[in-house]
Amino acid sequence: MGKNVVVIGTQWGDEGKGKIVDWLTDHAQGVIRFQGGHNAGHTLVIGQGAAQREYKLNLVPSGIVREGVRCYIGNGVVLDAGHLLEEIGGLESVGVEVRSRLMISPGCPLILGYHVSLDKAREAARTQGKKIGTTGKGIGPTYEDKVARRALRVYDLFYPERFAEKLAEVLDYHNFVLTRHLNTEAVDFQAQLDAAMKHAESLRPLVHDVSAALYDAHQAGHNLLFEGAQGTLLDVDHGTYPYVTSSNCVAGQASAGSGVGPSMLHYVLGITKAYCTRVGGGPFPSELDIETDATPGHQMSDKGREIGTVTRRKRRCGWFDAAALRRSARINGLTGLCITKLDVLDGLSELEICTGYKLDGKVVDLLPVGAEDVARCEPIYEVMPGWQETTFGVKRWDDLPANARAYLKRLEELCGVPVDIVSTGPERDETIVLRHPFGA
């Protein structure tokens, strides 16, 4: 039997999961996406010098840039067929073989044009201060249709008459909402049908029973890597609701969103920045000013190049929040942590760690459940000395500055999860390994 590892973001997304998934695929034969859609963005930097290439992926699992690794899109993913085919074409144009190594579950709900129209119209209608910060890509409305049992799924594409009947029914409902409630234009039935059917034959060879394929791979002794998107604090159930995404981003979804049994998941790796970031609206207790020069927040934003891969919006930045990570660790059952972007903190004289909050006159050591309570939290900080030496590209634990090691050990103590990996740069080999998830 192989060993299977789940990689999860523990904050509000953008933790650096793509690089770690790519690095781990050196020991995996398969990589699986199990939730989200093309609202997720992973940036991979592969190669050295003039041969270096940057890949920006949204739907295709990060393992695709590793030769011979099979990639799977599980039933928990919502699929924009046009975007997927465009992404595949982009990869193939630079010599990455995709189609022979990619499987798509027939159960993936399809993102169609009316989902995008609904997403954008709803966000535009929200008053300032209540905007979610959606990417406007139709993710939320597609998940709504899935739960309401009216979604069109990938396998529906291969039955044109049935697809047209279902489309007419669901479009009648959504056009009523668009025109009567949101005061925007209706979506044309024929245009939607033609757009969907255009992609059917291109997708057909890629569609397989992913659940069965993963079971067979596991039985054959393959190591499998489950690639989470977004982060735990954006989870629709466990995040800062309603400022969340529309899917479950936690480790438990790896099973539900791919069709493998929970007992087949052996190790959960939580990816965590050495500080915190957030894109879009919602409470952020340890948030700092990122606009004022020569401040810690500005350094995090500028040195960390904190711009959203998908949205191109500036990410909000703040001190590491151990109380938030403590909740993430429990929800996900984390086996180990991977700390990323440690070098962004190089040169700061002091570092602060949020260890808990004051809420209604009481001290709490765990991120509250509701966004309203989180917004009222006053962070409690512990101060630690910084370091002046560089940590960028360091490959051995003992070569890190003493204060950097002390900072990492303190994070470990506060969160109750061992730091197994430290990422010190975007390259594959800029990684310190204390314990390998695959036992290598």
UniProtKB/Swiss-Prot annotation:
Cell membrane in keyword set: no
Binding site for GTP: 13-19, 41-43, 315, 341-343
Lineage: Eukaryota, Viridiplantae, Streptophyta, Embryophyta, Tracheophyta
HAMAP family per the UniProt record, alphabetical: Adenylosucc_synth (MF_00011)
Note: This protein may be expected to contain an N-terminal transit peptide but none has been predicted.
Entry annotated with the keyword Nucleotide-binding: yes
Cofactor binding mode and count: Binds 1 Mg(2+) ion per subunit.
Listed EC numbers: 6.3.4.4
Domain of life: Eukaryota
Record-given protein name: Adenylosuccinate synthetase 1, chloroplastic
